[in-house]
């Protein structure tokens, strides 16, 4: 059975100018990779130049009984971009909001043990705050709609000290050993509220059921929670041309909460069996997953096939709704697909336990960037 060892995090993920590769838990203090010594071996370059090749991404995916959503923030030094997509699970109806954030030095913090990511634009307000030392996580968001889109307001909170709140940090080559990518994954049960306000009516969707008056109050069982979040922060050196594919899946199989993330790109390490960021959180345990191959032989809107060579992952993804954003300015070209759909198949944990997925909510992403 495939496995990778998970160890205690080092004091710094860069020591003596070299990255410390591996999988770590709990969370390290920072994801700062700027101190690498000569990450580009073509010629000696000052740090202020090589640091411009570092970009950061933050992604938060959430699942509730009625809705499935994902938020992605791109920190590209000279500009930041945020996109939130929300789908109604019963109908597949989509709400999409985008925001350019200019003249911000760094929207995604370097620290990971605690941090805050905010945007206070009038029509796009979001605040993401986490603190592992206090065991707190919160996400507040208010989005102003228009005649075709509802106003969206939601707030989530989670307990990072809960036994089902699991995290994993991977430091991997990108793709050579001189450069690295630092990726932090967190999965946790959520509580909070969610509301949609249309121009003609108000639809409120509570995430937690209130106890009847006079009933005894008790702590909910996190294993039976219906609301889950998957939080990812990635900081990496990028090529001038980069493309990647990913799949994030959340759901419950036979009463066991299942959450995992699969990722592959043209910056995968030369030895992906030894270093990769794929991870499964199931039954209160963390399982490093092997590298995968993601193909879509029937087109992006047809069935996707996700498999590995270790017989741990055998999945099919069926797209429901594709959100596309394309930009082309001089030599800059981007093409991002954020696809909501259903996932079916099987996945195994490190003990060989087989989980069968049926009608799981998932979001797949296919991204291309040329600078």
Label for each model-derived stretch:
Residues 1-371:
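Structured soluble/peripheral alpha/beta segments that form catalytic or ligand/cofactor-binding pockets
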């Amino acid at each position: 059975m495939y496995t990778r060892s998970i160890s205690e995090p080092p004091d710094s993920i860069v020591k003596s100018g070299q990255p410390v590769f591996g999988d770590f838990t709990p969370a390290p203090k920072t994801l700062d990779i700027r101190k690498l010594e000569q990450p580009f071996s073509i010629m000696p370059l000052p740090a202020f130049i090589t640091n411009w090749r570092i970009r950061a991404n933050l992604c938060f995916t959430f699942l509730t009984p009625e809705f499935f959503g994902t938020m992605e923030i791109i920190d590209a030094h000279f500009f930041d971009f945020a996109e939130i997509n929300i789908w109604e699970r019963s109908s597949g109806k989509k709400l999409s909001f985008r925001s350019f954030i200019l003249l911000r030095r760094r929207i995604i913090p370097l620290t990971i043990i605690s941090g805050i990511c905010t945007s206070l634009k009038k029509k796009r307000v979001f605040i993401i705050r986490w603190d592992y030392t206090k065991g707190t996580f919160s996400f507040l968001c208010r989005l102003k709609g228009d005649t075709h889109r509802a106003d969206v307001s939601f707030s989530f909170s989670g307990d990072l000290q809960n036994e089902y709140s699991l995290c994993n940090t991977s430091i991997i080559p990108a793709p050579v050993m001189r450069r690295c990518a630092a990726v932090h994954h967190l999965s946790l049960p959520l509580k909070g509220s969610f509301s949609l306000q249309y121009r003609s009516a108000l639809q409120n969707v509570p995430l937690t059921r209130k106890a009847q008056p006079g009933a005894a109050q008790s702590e909910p069982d996190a294993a039976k929670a219906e609301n889950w979040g998957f939080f990812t922060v990635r900081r990496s050196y990028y090529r001038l041309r980069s493309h990647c594919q990913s799949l994030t899946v959340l759901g419950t199989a036979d009463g066991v909460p299942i959450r995992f993330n699969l990722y592959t790109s043209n910056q995968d390490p030369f030895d992906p069996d030894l270093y990769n960021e794929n991870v499964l959180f199931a039954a209160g345990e963390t399982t490093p997953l092997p590298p995968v191959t993601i193909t879509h032989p029937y087109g992006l809107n047809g069935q996707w096939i996700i498999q590995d060579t270790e017989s741990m992952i055998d999945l099919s993804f069926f797209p429901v709704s594709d959100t596309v954003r394309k930009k082309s300015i001089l030599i800059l070209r981007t093409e991002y697909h954020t696809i909501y759909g259903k996932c079916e198949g099987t996945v195994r944990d490190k003990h060989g336990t087989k989980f069968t997925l049926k009608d799981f909510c998932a979001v797949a992403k296919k991204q291309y960037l040329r600078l």
